[in-house]
Amino acid sequence: MLTRLLRRGTSDTDGSQTRGAEPVEGQRTGPEEASNPGSARPRTRFGAWLGRPMTSFHLIIAVAALLTTLGLIMVLSASAVRSYDDDGSAWVIFGKQVLWTLVGLIGGYVCLRMSVRFMRRIAFSGFAITIVMLVLVLVPGIGKEANGSRGWFVVAGFSMQPSELAKMAFAIWGAHLLAARRMERASLREMLIPLVPAAVVALALIVAQPDLGQTVSMGIILLGLLWYAGLPLRVFLSSLAAVVVSAAILAVSAGYRSDRVRSWLNPENDPQDSGYQARQAKFALAQGGIFGDGLGQGVAKWNYLPNAHNDFIFAIIGEELGLVGALGLLGLFGLFAYTGMRIASRSADPFLRLLTATTTLWVLGQAFINIGYVIGLLPVTGLQLPLISAGGTSTAATLSLIGIIANAARHEPEAVAALRAGRDDKVNRLLRLPLPEPYLPPRLEAFRDRKRANPQPAQTQPARKTPRTAPGQPARQMGLPPRPGSPRTADPPVRRSVHHGAGQRYAGQRRTRRVRALEGQRYG
């Protein structure tokens, strides 16, 4: 009996030393840890890392670095043959891509250091400048025509596409506009009137080039802004229908675009002309197999597949890196989607929340369209694969937007609290970034949030007592309205106004499910 008691005491002592969930003396435990110790700490190291304040910032920087590095490697591999044929050197296209990547890194660093208030202040001016650039590029002698589209400026041998800058400026200005109008509880008309006409002007200028791919990309940005702003579903569906119908009309209006659509519907109709690119891209993907032919060992780039370094670089990735490399690239874009939506849902500023979600949708939509027409699911539109294809202005604009997303990650409430409490980050010290400012909502939004958190019960008005009239005394002498001929037991129905603004006054302010999904902590 004594031996059993000694063994039991020894096991209890060992168990108390190994159990880490029990609080020890001197250790502070919060109310949540005391009530539910299992949920206070993550079970794995990966879960603990995801719960750190700067995890979103590290994730977006790492994903952008991996995509940019992979893009530079594949541009060098896919463009060496064409560069040597055109200029006698295999490094020309790759060198230009490196220079544009440096420009994008500088732009991303500037956006990373920029304050949110200054960004919103210059949003409209930046969009207006890009509209002027879209007008100038249509002037003969100023804009350069390539591949049937007049949409480039050429300066010192470097080409710049103003439509890429217009998309970036429109996303920033649209997020600023919708965030401000949503705070003021503006009507649906007031929310749509500045945004949609401005988008129509930009789309019309891009269509005049003409450029179907950039038109579709601008439509994605507009739909993303409308969707994540929480507008009514009928407004979003009508906008989606308008964008789809416009894209369909543009696809069959011009000769080369209609040829692409016909070749997509029937690839065997003209395999040597309009369907040649799509056919060769499928051959390259099939040639790669599971593990690919090896980096730099592809055959399609030897003048078999036109624009192998640009629009159809995903086919070269599938040929040289195989199915494994293609799935790895898709995994990187999936990680980018998770990171962008994580930052959007954790942001306290409505402007950063809306801009981050829209930008994430834009990059993913463009990647989906590019990969879709390479593998044959969509007709060829000419959209580039973000951060992978050889496109100078596209790469610079995308890196600048990633700088804005990283800036939003630093403005998460937990990140702001950690950085301002002195728990600095190595990456922040290396980049010499300033401390982020906590989000301070306007007084109107703060008052509305307090009213929403503490709703007041509806007060019932007491029934008004009517004086009794003496028998034979008229009601007019008692100060009462004359009685009608027929008795009335209830108040007459109030006729409501049928003015269009009455029903739409606060139609844009309904907290839909997609808005609640992006609602993070409101105050930093």
Swiss-Prot record:
It comes from the Bacteria. One of its GO terms (cellular component) is plasma membrane. Residues 1-42, 448-524 are annotated as: Disordered. The keyword Transmembrane applies. One of its GO terms (biological process) is regulation of cell shape. Interacts with FtsZ via its C-terminal region, and with PbpB via two extracytoplasmic loops. This is Probable peptidoglycan glycosyltransferase FtsW. It comes from Mycobacterium tuberculosis (strain ATCC 25618 / H37Rv). The gene is ftsW.
